[in-house]
Curated annotation (Swiss-Prot):
Family: Belongs to the Maf family. YceF subfamily.
Entry's Gene Ontology BP terms: nucleotide metabolic process
Reaction catalysis annotation: N(7)-methyl-GTP + H2O = N(7)-methyl-GMP + diphosphate + H(+)
GO molecular function: nucleoside triphosphate diphosphatase activity
Protein name per its UniProtKB record: 7-methyl-GTP pyrophosphatase
Location(s), subcellular: Cytoplasm
Domain of life: Bacteria
Site (Important for substrate specificity): 16, 74, 158
Stated role: Nucleoside triphosphate pyrophosphatase that hydrolyzes 7-methyl-GTP (m(7)GTP). May have a dual role in cell division arrest and in preventing the incorporation of modified nucleotides into cellular nucleic acids.
GO terms for cellular component: cytoplasm
The enzyme's E.C. designation: 3.6.1.-
Cofactor(s) needed: a divalent metal cation
Length: 201
């Protein structure tokens, strides 16, 4: 990829991923991938996330033949149960009630696909989050202030949701929000893109 080549392509409709990628100050395009997100029989949740991140990148690459395409997917596990986006206040309260005082694991899958060469890099970046013991009143107060109904686990770590958390363990703190920038920086370097010296937007 030369410096006159097309920009990066982010295969995601998530505004959180767009905001994260913008931190690297690289020009990029956004494309909404159309993929079937149904898990395969016997597939672990982390394997599903990794497979979907690849499928999203491949879908975007179909219309971008000379680009570096970023695909990402995330699953949240509380023990053996997968937690999704609550969608409303009642489900969000139930999620936080179940999560309080416990540890949960976010698996954030990342794919970087070079649509010109066909090379594919993938990474699963886990983040363990320990939620504080919470009272019902605290949960209600948080939900009224933040309304995190579009976030898996009903907590926005980049905002007030950080107050729900006791500690977290991750090799890449941006993975929790949905796009592991440290891992992505390494992947881009493998494709000849030095984030620090590349022309900024």
């Amino acid at each position: 990829m030369t410096r006159t080549s097309p920009t990066l392509v982010l295969a995601s409709t998530s505004r959180y991923r767009r905001e994260l990628l913008a931190r690297l100050r690289l020009p990029f395009e956004v494309l909404a991938p159309n993929v079937d997100e149904t898990p395969l029989p016997g597939e672990t949740r982390s394997a599903t996330a990794l497979r979907l991140s690849v499928l999203k990148a491949q879908a975007a690459a179909m219309t971008h033949r000379d680009a570096l395409v970023i695909g990402s997917d995330q699953v949240l596990m509380l023990g053996t149960e997968q937690l999704g986006k609550p969608g409303d206040h009642e489900r969000a309260f139930a999620q936080l009630k179940k999560m309080q005082g416990r540890a949960m694991v976010f698996h954030t899958a990342l794919t970087l696909l070079n649509s010109r060469t066909g090379s594919v890099q993938t990474r699963d970046v886990p983040t363990v989050v320990h939620i504080r013991p919470l009272t019902d009143a605290q949960i209600e107060a948080y939900l009224k202030k933040e309304q995190p109904y579009d976030c898996a686990g009903s907590a926005k770590s980049e905002a007030l949701g950080i107050a729900l958390m006791e500690r977290m363990e991750s090799p890449d703190p941006t993975a929790l929000i949905g796009l592991p920038l440290m891992a992505l920086t390494e992947m881009l370097a493998q494709e000849g893109v030095d984030v620090l010296t590349w022309p900024a937007t």
